[in-house]
């Protein structure tokens, strides 16, 4: 069955109406809550190497990846870079907006290309109110994201390079939903 994308009032293609929800946060919402958010979501294709955010710049939109995987990269004063987080189909890029911030301390760069839903930061702020279904799902994701970052830091300190590469490959597989990806 072919999925039709109909133009919205702004002329952008709408998200696929018949397609299953592939982002973990959006999929965890009740169907009525997801349908309420749908007009605020724009389906976009993220390209490998695309910079979504630059460090210390305003976050204008958040992204809910489907197949895409985005790395959060920290750059030290002397120019060295470190991957400090990976976000794929389980999460949201731009979590600082949910946490009350307006900027990101890190650069967000697409590692694996694919689809994502983009939502304006102001729309997310309005939709995340105390006790809302979206707020509850984002809180659960935030707790999980922090645990994954903690595990990643421990792995980088205590494991050999082969083990770290294996963890990274498994993470890419989990977060992209694909066994194949470009390197």
Regions found by a protein language model. Give the residues of each.
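Residues that scaffold the ATP/ADP-binding catalytic core of kinase and kinase-like folds
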Residues: 37, 73, 95-96, 127, ...
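Nucleotide phosphate-binding site architecture
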Residues: 35, 53, 117, 125
């Amino acid at each position: 069955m072919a999925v039709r994308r109909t133009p919205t009032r702004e002329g952008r293609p709408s998200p696929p109406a018949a397609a299953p929800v592939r982002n973990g946060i959006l999929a965890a919402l009740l169907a009525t809550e997801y349908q309420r958010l749908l007009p605020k979501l724009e389906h976009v294709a993220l390209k490998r190497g695309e910079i979504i955010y630059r460090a210390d710049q305003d976050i204008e939109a958040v992204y809910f990846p489907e197949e895409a995987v985005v790395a959060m990269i920290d750059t030290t004063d002397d120019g060295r870079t470190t991957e400090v987080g990976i976000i794929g189909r389980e999460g949201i890029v731009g979590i600082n907006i949910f946490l009350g911030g307006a900027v990101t301390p890190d650069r967000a760069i697409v590692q694996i290309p694919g689809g994502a839903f983009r939502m304006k930061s102001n729309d997310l702020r309005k939709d995340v109110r105390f006790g809302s279904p979206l707020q509850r799902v984002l809180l659960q994701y935030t707790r999980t994201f922090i645990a994954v970052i903690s595990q990643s830091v421990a792995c980088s300190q205590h494991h050999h390079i082969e083990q770290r590469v294996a963890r990274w490959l498994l993470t890419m597989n989990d977060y992209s939903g694909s066994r194949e990806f470009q390197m």
